[in-house]
């Protein structure tokens, strides 16, 4: 069969498999590619190909992640699978592989286990919008009542972390049966049912271009006779010449007007998500703007100093700290383009944080940053990355 041309006309969605070790995340990933390959929607990736995940660096942290892609009738998917639990933690916190939704894999034989719980909590903290459950290894359970009990347990667990436990689709099957072609009903058919659930239940993410304009400022120049130009890569939205925009963060918020957009020395009418541009600002002095601020659509993002975060602290081997830290730890928090010092408060019951831990913590910055939930940051000491985090809740 001739290979199909990669179609860009389907909506794209990023997903991944999460769940406890040995519950079948990688087998399921392989099974999805195998079943979808029959209709030309994927190229089959065997278990061993996925399991040997290459290492990548994200925000100075090494993570092993396997990427596969496939398509259903409805969408094109990029799917991430990680070999180890630590890789999941790092992946979700750094946002190295953005997840628009996830497939939670739970073994019917074991039911929810500690990492099941931890991955659900992480998904909640880092803002994964929706989950679908695959209850795997159902061929290892003879008693249908037991399957019902496991399903109830999963739903209660999801609800306890503020996911809609009663509504989340739970598909029962066996990834191995699909890989071995042994039992069509719980193998092949269950995988197709799972993908239908993923198509229907995981919402299509808004394209970056359609969101409100935001550009982190990387550099500021003064051009005689023309005014002040700020440069950076537009993170989302569109900026048009003549539009009113805000400069947010570090200093009090000010309004200005975009009087020009320039890319590769050419003048444009507008810049959009993904473009590296220079934006000319009307009546703004060079000293009024600095790296670390953002340009944005008025009112779309606000400056804050206090937030709750989920963070991963690097091990000594990863180039991180050699010793634990305690409440009142004062590192720098690197947001977008700049470092801001902040004070850490650990939650009650957490005495200290060891290298290699992931932890929930509150942070108070010494200067405000344009902030919203899901914003990623690095934790640094004198320019060296010692951790990574994500804003789970803006407090003040």
From Swiss-Prot:
GO CC aspect terms: cytosol
Cellular localization per UniProt: Cytoplasm
Residues the record lists as binding Mg(2+): 26
Reaction catalysed by this enzyme: GTP + H2O = GDP + phosphate + H(+)
Region (G3) location: 81-84
Entry keyword set: Cytoplasm, Elongation factor, GTP-binding, Hydrolase, Magnesium, Metal-binding, Nucleotide-binding, Protein biosynthesis
SUPFAM superfamilies in the record: EF-Tu/eEF-1alpha/eIF2-gamma C-terminal domain, P-loop containing nucleoside triphosphate hydrolases, Translation proteins
PROSITE patterns: G_TR_1 (PS00301), G_TR_2 (PS51722)
Pfam families listed in its UniProt record: GTP_EFTU, GTP_EFTU_D2, GTP_EFTU_D3
Quaternary structure (record): Monomer.
Protein name as annotated: Elongation factor Tu
Biological classification of the source: Bacteria, Pseudomonadati, Pseudomonadota, Alphaproteobacteria, Hyphomicrobiales
Gene expressing this chain: tuf1
């Amino acid at each position: 069969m001739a290979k199909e041309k990669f179609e860009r006309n389907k909506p794209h969605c990023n997903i991944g498999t999460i769940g406890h070790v040995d519950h079948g995340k990688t087998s399921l990933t392989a099974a999805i590619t195998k079943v979808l390959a029959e209709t030309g929607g994927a190229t089959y990736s065997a278990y061993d190909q996925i399991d040997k995940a290459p290492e990548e660096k994200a925000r100075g942290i090494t993570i092993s992640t396997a990427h596969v892609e496939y398509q259903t009738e409805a969408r094109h998917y990029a799917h991430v699978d990680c070999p180890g639990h630590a890789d999941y933690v790092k992946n979700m916190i750094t946002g190295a592989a953005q997840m628009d939704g996830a497939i939670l894999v739970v073994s019917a034989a074991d039911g929810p286990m500690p990492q099941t719980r931890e991955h659900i909590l992480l998904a909640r903290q880092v803002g994964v919008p929706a989950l679908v459950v695959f209850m795997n290894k159902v061929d290892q359970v003879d008693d249908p009542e037991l399957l019902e009990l496991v399903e109830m347990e999963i739903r209660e667990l999801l609800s306890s972390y503020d996911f809609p436990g009663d509504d989340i689709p739970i598909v029962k099957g066996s990834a191995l049966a699909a890989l071995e072609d042994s039992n069509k009903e719980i193998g092949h058919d269950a995988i197709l049912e799972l993908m239908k659930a993923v198509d229907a239940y995981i919402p299509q993410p808004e394209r970056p271009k359609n969101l409100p304009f935001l550009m982190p400022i990387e550099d500021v120049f003064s051009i005689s006779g023309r005014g002040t130009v700020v440069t950076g890569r537009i993170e989302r939205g569109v900026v048009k010449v003549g539009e009113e925009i805000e400069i947010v963060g570090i200093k009090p918020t000010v309004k200005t007007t975009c009087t020009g957009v320039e890319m590769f020395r050419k003048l444009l009418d507008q810049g959009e998500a993904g473009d590296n541009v220079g934006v000319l600002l009307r009546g703004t002095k060079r000293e009024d703007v600095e790296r670390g601020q953002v340009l944005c659509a008025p009112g779309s993002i606000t400056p804050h100093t206090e937030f709750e975060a989920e963070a991963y602290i690097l091990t000594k081997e990863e180039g991180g700290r050699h010793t634990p830290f305690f409440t009142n730890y004062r590192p720098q928090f690197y947001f977008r383009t700049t470092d801001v010092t902040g004070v850490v408060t650990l939650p009650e019951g957490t005495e200290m944080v060891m290298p290699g831990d992931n932890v929930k913590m509150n942070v108070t910055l010494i200067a405000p940053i344009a902030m919203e939930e899901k914003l990623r940051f690095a934790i640094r000491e004198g320019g060296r990355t010692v951790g990574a985090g994500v804003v789970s809740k803006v407090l003040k």
